[in-house]
Amino acid sequence: MTESTDPSSRAGEAGALWGGRFAGGPSPELVALSRSTHFDWQLAPYDIAGSRAHARALAAAGYLSDAERQAMLQALDTLEDRVRSGALVASEADEDVHGALERGLMDIAGPDLGGKLRAGRSRNDQIATLVRMYLRDHAAVIHAMLVQLVDALAAQAEAAGGAIMPGRTHLQHAQPVLLAHHLLAHCWPLVRDLERLADWDARADVSPYGSGALAGSTLGLDASAVARDLGFARSSENSIDGTAARDVVAEFAFVLAQVGIDLSRLSEEIILWNTREFGFVTLSDSFSTGSSIMPQKKNPDIAELARGKSGRLIGNLSGLLATLKGLPLAYNRDLQEDKEPVFDSVQTLEVLLPAFTGMIATLRFDVDRMAELAPQGFSLATDVAEWLVKHRVAFRDAHEITGELVKLAESRGVGLEDLSDDDLRAVSPHLVPEVREVLSIDGSVASRDGVGGTARVRVDEQRAELVRRVAELRARADAAAERRAAASAAASA
């Protein structure tokens, strides 16, 4: 079959935005390889928003009359309605979301008017901008979900009150701590994740629109006006960097991977705590599953999936970094591969976080079991050593004396508190009966009242500070969203 020699026909048939310098159309194999609509179609709302801003910029520069501008904006509104309703979807012939939407616009506005929209912009600056818009919107969604998770953990910490649990290092009994202190220890990494999202947004708040393919545009379009219209604070300082940089995507993928790691660490503990051997927690029926063969099973699937999906998030980051590491400036087609990993990370967390928060909010803690295990494993040994230090024994000697005491108790199969006064004196004359004052988990916890310690008074202060910090971060996020919306509304008015 003879291929058409009309380049506009070839481009239209292929759903591509190029073709004039080619004698023939692309091979079916190349078309299949190049097609990206199966993942970039979700950028369609952002593409249309960008087209509106671009149409206004073209009109301001004199490339569209007032009537053409109005007709173009109406056509874009119709295009958006068709996308939302599903009346317009990407076809097999469409190379990417840009080509599919241009095809849809041509059907609505006609080729004469619709064909004017492409002036002064490239897919290179388009896609760099649209990805930022998508990520910024989803950063706000994930931010709100993380706040809900921190709120759920903080509520559990408040409900725990003075409940004591065994604190561990190396997964071995270490020192008794408040359950609330332990739960709050999982809140602070998530707060830092919230801060990272806010920090990231400050760097993402730059519009590459106007950078063209790499060198900018000769048409005199106001890139700053487009940036404001799309909710950005400013335009890219360098057009090459604007089209080629993907560090903002990689950084976002890192933040999401770090969130995944923080969830995975908590998940590992919940999985352990849910075993018979620990017996610290009971999962809600609504947030656990059973076995297809073992009727007694109640499995911590959400925690296990969170632990598993953290590897997926790390893999997405690693793959993205590997793609970026050897690219010369400016744009390269390799950058098509930036979207699937980060889109997958976004979608993974947006499904995972609500389920994870529900699991946390409905956990029931067996505080009696925790209190029973808290003094085991000679977890009060450090209290004995520090008591000796307070009585003017050098810590090196205190450490040695306490170690001998532990050895004696261990050999008899008893706890430190079960040793007699004679046993204490036999180990060291410094171990007088008054040392028993520290051989209780309540006394141990209460004595650790330095800043950041596990004493109840410090934990209550810590929780109050956490609530304050989260409220501040929530307010900052809300204010940033309002500023973006106001700037966009003002620019498009």
Curated annotation (Swiss-Prot):
EC number: 4.3.2.1
Stated name of the protein: Argininosuccinate lyase
Top-level class of the enzyme under EC nomenclature: lyase
Lineage: Bacteria, Bacillati, Actinomycetota, Actinomycetes, Micrococcales
NCBIfam families given in the database record: argH
InterPro entries referenced in this protein's UniProt entry, alphabetically: Arg_succ_lyase_C (IPR029419), Argininosuccinate_lyase (IPR009049), Fumarase/histidase_N (IPR024083), Fumarate_lyase_CS (IPR020557), Fumarate_lyase_fam (IPR000362), Fumarate_lyase_N (IPR022761), L-Aspartase-like (IPR008948)
Pfam families the record matches: ASL_C2, Lyase_1
UniProt-recorded Gene Ontology molecular function terms: argininosuccinate lyase activity
